[in-house]
Amino acid sequence: YYERNIEGVSAAVTNQIPGDGRILVCYQPEKHSSAVLQEIRYDPATERCERTTLKTYDGFNAGNPEKVRQLFADAAELAPAQNYGLIIGCHGKAWIPVASGSLSYSMRRSAEDDLWAAPPGAKQTRSFGDKGYELNITELKEALEAQQFRFDYLIFDDCFMANIET
């Protein structure tokens, strides 16, 4: 799924794109054991789209807010720009927080108003990421606020989270 999305972006990067914009991708090709920060760009010398690894992260956990904060800082340092955009592609749990775990079969079949009710004492929030590597939206917010720049847009390409950013 993710590789296909990255290939789709790469197919759109041609010599017909004006300007000097840069596209960076953080991808975990080895499941959850590592990550790579890559740049997707058109190379006039080879006349094709190239993917170049800018940085490799060993033991990268996308569910760790500090690791995510550092990833954003690294991207800004390696590709300084006037404007930034962010697309997050992973699994999503919509309005269900990380601490809720997996939904049981009976919960999936509950009435709609029961399914989205927060547990007693829990903050209503959202999470995304694979089981054990999830990040709450509030943790993403903190990682974003720690940066010296702001993203111009944020898109979730996640199950259950399409259009949740609005």
List each language-model region with its residue ranges:
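Residue-identity detector for glycine
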Residues: G8, G19-G21, G59, G63, ...
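Short, solvent-exposed loop/turn and secondary-structure capping segments
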Residues: V36-L37, I96-S102
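Aromatic- and acidic-residue-enriched segments that line the glycan-binding/catalytic groove
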Residues: G101-E112
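N-terminal extension/subdomain marker
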Residues: Y1-Q82
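Catalytic cores of nucleophile-dependent amide-cleaving enzymes
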Residues: I87-I96, A111-T166
